[in-house]
Amino acid sequence: MCGAPEQTQELPPGTDLSKQTVVAGTVRTAGEPLGGAYVRLLDDTGEFTAEVVSSASGQFRFFAAPGSWTIRALHRSGIGESTVTANTPGLYTVAVTVS
């Protein structure tokens, strides 16, 4: 079981987006939110960096360093992947479709 905090749409209190890079989004399948997916953050070399489980509403969130990231969602119903370039601090929203 993943020990990550519960995933919600709201950022934790005290999050300063002028200093922190946050990659967040929703995992979907057939247009519907997909909870219980293992969502992985991979760096620009494909190296595994972190993992969370998507919330019941499909949401996930990572605090990351600036850079190019791949977000991969794994679920018994399939796999989905998306990329994001987050070169500066801020909130970057990613949609991942599992099929």
Regions found by a protein language model. Name each.
Residues 59-64, 94-96:
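Exposed aromatic-hydrophobic patches
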Residues 3, 76-99:
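Structured interaction patches on ligand/partner-binding surfaces of diverse proteins
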